[in-house]
């Protein structure tokens, strides 16, 4: 009988740890959907405007792709442009979680680019594309530098 009770306690403990890890992960509150703009998958917060947010991220991603391509053609010998081209991955663009203290960030030089798409933390009003593109250009600059 002691083994059964011990086994149940271990099972419950492990289950709680697994749930806590999943709950605190980036993917807990994100739903990945395909944008109609470019056909790529974007992971966005679960809410009513899933398609609008995915399309906004797709438009900004297209703007980033155009900029990176333009820089690649215009300044092919510059090391910072080469780093930007190497580090930029348009398939790794996400929306930030509501728990994030950042409006935008890049992880590990391009493994992930995350953007807040609303005007306020709790708001439902989407930020305009030009403002988000401005923020995205700032994040791209982090990919082009050697340090943070």
Residue ranges and their predicted role:
Residues 139:
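Walker B catalytic acidic pair
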Residues 136:
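A conserved beta-strand element that flanks and buttresses the S-adenosyl-L-methionine
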Residues 1-133, 143-148:
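Active-site-proximal or metal-binding-adjacent scaffold patches in catalytic folds
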């Amino acid at each position: 009988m002691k083994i059964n009770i011990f086994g149940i306690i271990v099972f419950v403990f492990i289950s709680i740890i697994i749930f806590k890890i999943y709950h605190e992960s980036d993917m807990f509150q994100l739903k990945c959907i395909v944008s109609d703009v470019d056909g790529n998958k974007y992971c966005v917060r679960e809410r009513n405007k899933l398609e609008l947010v995915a399309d906004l991220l797709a438009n900004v991603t297209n703007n980033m792709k155009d900029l990176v391509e333009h820089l690649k053609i215009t300044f092919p010998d510059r090391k910072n442009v080469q780093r930007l081209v190497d580090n930029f991955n348009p398939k790794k663009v996400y929306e930030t979680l509501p728990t994030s203290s950042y409006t935008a960030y890049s992880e590990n030089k391009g493994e992930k680019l995350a953007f807040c798409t609303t005007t306020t933390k709790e708001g439902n009003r989407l930020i305009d594309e030009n403002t988000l593109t401005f923020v995205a250009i700032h994040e791209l600059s982090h990919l082009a530098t050697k340090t943070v």
